[in-house]
Swiss-Prot record:
GO molecular function annotations of the record: adenylosuccinate synthase activity; GTP binding; magnesium ion binding
Cofactor note: Binds 1 Mg(2+) ion per subunit.
Keyword Cell membrane: no
Binding site for GTP: 13-19, 41-43, 304, 410-412
UniProt record similarity statement: Belongs to the adenylosuccinate synthetase family.
Gene3D superfamilies: Adenylosuccinate Synthetase, subunit A, domain 1, Adenylosuccinate Synthetase, subunit A, domain 2, Adenylosuccinate Synthetase, subunit A, domain 3
Task performed by this protein: Plays an important role in the de novo pathway of purine nucleotide biosynthesis. Catalyzes the first committed step in the biosynthesis of AMP from IMP.
Higher taxonomy: Bacteria, Pseudomonadati, Bacteroidota, Bacteroidia, Bacteroidales
A GO CC annotation given for this chain: cytoplasm
UniProt name for this protein: Adenylosuccinate synthetase
Annotated catalysed reactions: IMP + L-aspartate + GTP = N(6)-(1,2-dicarboxyethyl)-AMP + GDP + phosphate + 2 H(+)
Subunit field text: Homodimer.
Length: 423
């Protein structure tokens, strides 16, 4: 019996998972999303074209692979339709290569309104959601009031009506306007018809059956481990488990059937929206990282906050996920820096710690180690033998600090700009 390999981000998202899953998929038969929704996007460059995938697994560009939207995902039929139709116009017909779990929850039009209403009600305490209705959908799921993909097959109208009325009562209590709901709802209902073109499956049986028959499965996470609802920088987190454990609950896979865990991180660190960020830079260096790394959200377009790499946070997420292989992205962004800093510890209340704290507050001061930069372009490097000495030293330093080997290094956005190390 085969095991599921897992690919996930180790920081606050935007690590480059889309590109790497596209690199890895030739080795797998099935690519499956296990959590999250359209609030996070994977940017891929394929045959010179740039694509942003929000709900659809990144294996969609690889021939006859089966792509699965798992039960842990929350799905907006309207945004899914827009995404799928855009891919179809580019020559990528999904209907024969994408299946959807019946147990995946649906993001309703009123969930979007609830998202906005809840943020407005928080005033200065808002956490900066993307407004896609993710949180309210997971709230309904946990409170056992959710609408699932499988409900589209029978009893949908009544279940939808009951959920909608409940949402409207909440919106009215918050004095939030619903004048735009009718138009959104009409388009959403039309999109559910489009959704029915795809095969609905009991994905837990599909995945486990595939493993039993010797097929290889890659589970693809969204966002990053530091946004995990339990272990992230709460309350500035997402509404699902983004760590490896989320693969088990989001696909129906037993823990003993998890194989390699690929942990992706950038050679620096970024964050979108509100929330603590100990190594954030507010100077020209931060602006330079943003410019060179093109750090703007693939879904929201928001400028990402940038800072030096945080090894305290990385050690924490490596531990949580049981990472077996590391993948370093955007090494080329660091090409021009004469000195590179890495946070190796935090100072809190005058005491130094290497552990990730309960609260990431303003009282956390990063303790840095400085390393010499390589100050030459990495974008045309094709093998580890061509690495500058300073870059090889940087990798060796990271591996010693993190306790896991770096198996893959990315030196540019294209698939070809990926170096598989012989370590």
């Amino acid at each position: 019996m085969e095991k599921v390999d897992v690919l996930l981000g180790l920081q606050w998202g935007d690590e480059g998972k889309g590109k790497i899953v596209d690199v890895l998929t030739p080795h797998y038969d099935i690519v499956a999303r296990f959590q999250g929704g359209p609030n996070a996007g994977h940017t891929l460059e394929f045959n010179g074209e740039k694509y942003v995938l929000r709900s659809i697994p990144s294996g969609i560009f690889q021939g006859e692979k089966t792509n699965v939207i798992g039960n842990g995902v929350v799905l907006d039929p309207l945004l899914f339709k827009e995404e799928a139709e855009a891919l179809a116009r580019s020559g990528h017909d999904l209907t024969k290569r994408l299946v959807i779990s019946r147990k995946a929850h649906l993001i309703m039009p009123t969930h979007r309104l609830l998202d906005a209403a809840n943020e407005m009600a928080k005033g200065s305490g808002k956490i900066g959601t993307t407004g896609k209705g993710i949180g309210p959908t997971y709230t309904d799921k946990v409170s056992r009031n959710g609408l699932r993909v499988g409900d589209l097959e029978h009893g949908f109208e009544e279940a939808y009506s009951v959920a909608k009325e409940r949402h409207l009562r909440i919106l009215n209590s918050l004095n939030y306007p619903t004048d735009k709901l009718a138009d959104l709802e009409e388009r959403w209902m039309e999109a559910t018809k489009y959704l029915r073109k795809f095969e609905f499956v009991d994905s837990e049986f599909l995945i486990n059956g595939a493993l039993l028959s010797g097929k290889k499965v890659l589970a693809e996470g969204a966002q990053g481990s530091l946004l995990d609802i339990d272990f992230g920088s709460y309350p500035f987190v997402t509404s699902s488990n983004t760590i490896c454990a989320g693969c088990c609950t989001g696909l129906g896979v037993a823990p003993r059937n998890v194989g390699d865990v690929y942990g992706i991180f950038k050679a620096y660190c970024t964050r979108v929206g509100a929330g603590p960020f100990p190594t954030e830079l507010f100077d020209e260096t931060g602006d330079k990282l943003c410019e060179l790394g093109r750090e703007f959200g693939s879904v929201t377009g928001r400028k990402r906050r940038c800072g030096w790499i945080d090894l305290v946070a990385l050690r924490y997420t490596i531990m949580l996920n049981g990472v077996t292989k590391l993948i370093m992205m955007k090494s080329d962004v660091m090409d021009l820096f004469p000195t590179i800093k890495a946070c190796v510890a935090y100072e809190i209340d005058g005491k130094e710690t290497r552990n990730f704290p309960f609260h990431l507050t303003e009282g956390v001061t990063p303790v840095y180690k400085e390393l010499p930069g390589w100050q030459q372009s990495m974008t045309n490097v094709v093998s580890e033998a061509d690495f500058p000495k300073e870059f090889s030293d940087y990798i060796a330093f990271l591996e010693k600090e993190l306790g896991v080997g770096i198996a893959i290094v990315s030196v540019g956005p294209d698939r070809e700009q990926t170096i598989i190390r012989q370590a």
